[in-house]
Amino acid sequence: MDTPTWEVVAALKRNQVLNSIPKEWRKPNIRKEMISSGYVNTYEYLNLILPPEENAITNLSMLELATNIAKGNYTSYNVTKAFCHRAALAHQILNCCIEIFFDEALKKAKELDDVFQKTSKVVGPFHGIPISLKDQVDLPGKDSSIGYVSLVGKPKTEIALLAKILQDKGAIFYVKTTVPMAMMAPQTVSNLHGYTYNALNINLSSGGSSGGEGALLGSGASCCGIGTDIGGSIRIPSCFQGLYALKPSTGRISYLNVTNSYSGQELIPSVIGPMARSLKDIEFFTETVIASEAWKIDSKLLPIPWKNQSHLKSKKLIFGVLKTDGIVKPHPPIIRALNEVVAVLEKSGYEVIEISIPFQKDMLDTVVKVFSADARFEINNESQKTGEPVVSVVKRFVSDKIFKKPITVNEWWDLGNQVYKIRQMFLELWNNTAIQTLSGNSIDAIIAPIWASTSFLPESKADHLYTSLFNICDCPCVVFPFTKVDANIDLSDVSYKPLNEEDKENNDMYDPVLFDNMPVCLQVVTKKLEEEKCLAAASSIMDCLTN
């Protein structure tokens, strides 16, 4: 019997995903109907066509849902069904799911309802809460194909420790979401699933590599999801969909039994964290997970208990703002957001200073070398198993041109020394901000862009990273939405003279009409392992904005 071609395997997988949706929820023309109705925003369109009683559920935050379930106002079954229905439609518009298992989710919801009915108690803080998972988070009996055709039909036997922690506390899993090939790209495209579009504007990219997660959350079809981040993969999709998110430092949240590219590459390790529509949900998730003391099971975790930093919300923290990295200037709405956040903080009595990163180019060069150290051997090898081509966006991010062949151990050690040098330079830069501040103390946190645009057209050559400095330096980052693009205000700067070709490409890409109404998100960054402080800093910023 002939081995099926990669095209056949990919087509069968896509059909399998669609066939996992109940017949009454299959709408093959829904994307066309949405466009013909004049909508580009999937969240708004789904609110229009779905039952009001389901919207009432899916528009709540995770904490609000948990409270309502614990009070008996909603059953786990009704909550799960509402999110499954919305996810089914969102996938058919955005192409954001790679595994769908609604039947299992609804069965689990019924079991939780039975427990609640008998005991009048919830099994844990996530009782009855549907949580979506990035494809790489292992579940028994489910593929973790991470964008490769070769990994289809090879289900996992173990459950990721993080998933087990959530499940034991009452969470319900119902989908796994799309990723780019090898999860090494800032947009979500693979030969396996195709392209994943932006939930708030289907003409644009959802970002990557947690792009399926970002799209699902942005459409309102998830209240909380799990992403991973090695160069911006949690932050970029969260930014493009107006979400909150946490990229933690290494060693705070378990990566055990999470499938990964370049497993064992520890110079710039991937981390795992929550994405949600509420900052309080991010805080709730992180505190609950860290309180589970998973370091007793996962040897890579650091035994650092959760430290309540709520007192910092009343302290006047000192912020440093990074407006540009000196290589690619962010688009006008992002510059406006940075100026406005400074004004808002200063009006509320916070000290804000401007900072710059003089070694940004060296840092980016080092990141690319780390990611390309095997001369793309792993990706080429996995792709060649089925003959599928390496997708172009991954080729740009993981080069086979920098090194002709995988580098030697000695060259890897040299790279390790370069990473250490950059971390030291960054720490010294941070500590030296004390010279600039009125108090003589160094800054508490940095506010920076996440990307130089609020999204981009699918398949665009948009590759410049504002995120990777904080990966190489292992800093926690919190994403928060600050404003939206306003085509009447955020006009193109026709007098701007680009600094280089990459800057010119980014500048030429800007179209205020195309990006109108897109969210403008920023990231707040603290020193390594200061997740609690980072969340408190984000909360302080949001309080200033609200007030």
From Swiss-Prot:
Major enzyme class = hydrolase
Source domain of life: Eukaryota
| SUPFAM superfamilies registered for this protein in UniProt | Amidase signature (AS) enzymes
MF terms in GO = amidase activity; fatty acid amide hydrolase activity
The UniProt entry, under Gene3D superfamilies, shows: Amidase signature (AS) domain
Question: Coiled-coil stretches, from where to where?
Answer: none
Any one GO CC term of this protein is: cytosol
Alphabetical keyword list: Cytoplasm, Hydrolase
Q: What is its EC number?
A: 3.5.1.4
Q: Tell me what reaction this enzyme catalyses.
A: a monocarboxylic acid amide + H2O = a monocarboxylate + NH4(+)
Q: Which Pfam families does the record cross-reference, listed alphabetically?
A: Amidase (PF01425)
Record has Transcription regulation as a keyword: no
- The record's active-site residues are K134, S209, S233
One GO biological process term is:
amide catabolic process
Does Cytoplasm show up as a keyword for this record? yes
Describe the family membership recorded for this protein in Swiss-Prot or TrEMBL. Belongs to the amidase family.
Task: Give the protein name, as stated in the record.
Answer: Putative amidase PB8B6.03
